[in-house]
A protein has these predicted regions:
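A solvent-exposed interaction/effector surface
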Residues: 4-176
Length: 176
């Protein structure tokens, strides 16, 4: 199976979350902890995607194929690119294959609250800035404080042209 076939499926497992507040394209969500694979590098996002894709395609200690999931997390910070794949919920830190590539970190994320704004099309820096501003304005209006940097997530294969789903997200201080 080629890369395009593996990332063109619409039947991916999606990371679980609970919607706390929903208003138009804005949501506050609670995300329970999940297992993730992360690459931090000064390479472009395509290089990071390739490393993570190779890991789930069998470049790991068990030579095991791991199913693709959604979303893919992406952040640019101080000339570094960070990309994370969520691992299928059937895996634990103890059961998942270890990457052969030392630049890939497998970790268990903490349960947290996030605010997001959803948008369509292909994401780019202009759309990220526009929707980031919109998200920060909405959080300010609701008097909700942020924690950490903004980042974006993508739910679709690059080969999907229509009805794409992207989101700008940020961790928030929230008590349910």
């Amino acid at each position: 199976m080629c890369i395009r076939d593996r990332i063109n499926s619409s039947s991916y497992e999606t990371q679980k979350y609970e919607i706390i507040i929903s208003e138009d394209d804005f949501e506050i969500r609670f995300y329970p902890s999940s297992l993730k694979a992360k690459v931090v590098s000064d390479r472009n996002a395509n290089g990071n995607f390739y490393k993570l894709f190779q890991f789930i395609s069998g470049n790991n200690t068990k030579g095991e194929k791991i199913e693709m999931t959604t979303p893919v997390y992406m952040k640019e910070n101080d000339n570094l690119n960070i990309m994370e794949f969520v691992m299928p919920s059937s895996y634990t830190l103890g059961s998942i294959s270890k990457p052969n590539d030392d630049s890939i970190e497998i970790y268990e994320s903490e349960a947290k609250y996030f605010a997001c704004i959803r948008y369509g099309g292909y994401s780019n820096s202009g759309k990220f800035k526009t929707h980031s501003k919109k998200l920060i304005e909405k959080l300010s209006e609701l008097n909700i404080k942020t924690k950490g940097d903004l980042f974006y997530v993508s739910y679709n294969s690059p080969y999907k042209v229509f009805n794409r789903r992207n989101e700008v997200m940020v961790e928030v201080e929230y008590e349910d």
